[in-house]
């Protein structure tokens, strides 16, 4: 697992990642008692906001150094060092959430299968991964998928 992240530098230079996530959290709309998995939780700021809504949230990240401040600052939350390509849980989650993390993992198919396996039937996946180059890939995939359904998205 990668461990090249610096939590101090991340907090100083990339706080916008969690500060601008209000709309994404609104889409997630966490409810009291829901089981929610936060994939690529980093230092845990958004995971904590999900927990504040009353959800039972588990934060996972592949970087032990990023999880250190999460565990220190939010000890009431369950934190796991895990690879997003290989998520295995005994019970499914009501929702999987991810903000600004998945674009760092080149094995998108493995991540998608892993996320799908973590969700209960009818569960929801709410994510933002608009890193450099991703948006064009997503647009092209949507155009192809639309064309297969007879919908012109160009």
Give names to the regions the model predicted.
Residues 19, 45, 65, 103-106, ...:
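Short alpha-helical
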Residues 35-39, 43-87:
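Class I SAM-dependent methyltransferase SAM/SAH-binding core
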Residues 1-34, 45-49, 66-69, 73, 124-151:
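Conserved class I S-adenosyl-L-methionine
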Residues 85-96:
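A short acidic, Gly/Pro-enriched loop at the edge of an enzyme's catalytic core
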Residues 95-108:
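A short SAM/SAH-binding and catalytic strip from SAM-dependent methyltransferases
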Residues 109-124:
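A short glycine-rich, Lys/Arg-flanked "PGG" loop and its adjoining helix->strand segment in the class I
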């Amino acid at each position: 697992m990668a461990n090249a992240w610096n939590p101090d530098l991340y907090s100083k230079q990339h706080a916008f990642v969690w500060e601008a996530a209000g709309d994404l959290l609104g889409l997630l709309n966490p409810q009291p008692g829901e089981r929610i998995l936060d994939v690529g939780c980093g230092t845990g700021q958004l995971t904590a906001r999900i927990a504040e809504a009353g959800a039972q949230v588990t934060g996972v990240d592949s970087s032990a150094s990023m999880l250190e401040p999460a565990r220190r600052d939010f000890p009431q939350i369950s934190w796991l060092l895990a690879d997003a390509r290989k998520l295995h849980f005994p019970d499914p989650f009501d929702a999987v959430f991810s903000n600004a993390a998945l674009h760092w993992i080149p094995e998108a198919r493995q991540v998608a299968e892993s996320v799908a396996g973590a969700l209960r039937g009818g569960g929801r996946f709410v994510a933002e991964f608009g890193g450099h180059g991703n948006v064009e890939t997503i647009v092209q995939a949507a155009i192809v998928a639309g064309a297969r359904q007879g919908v012109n998205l160009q």
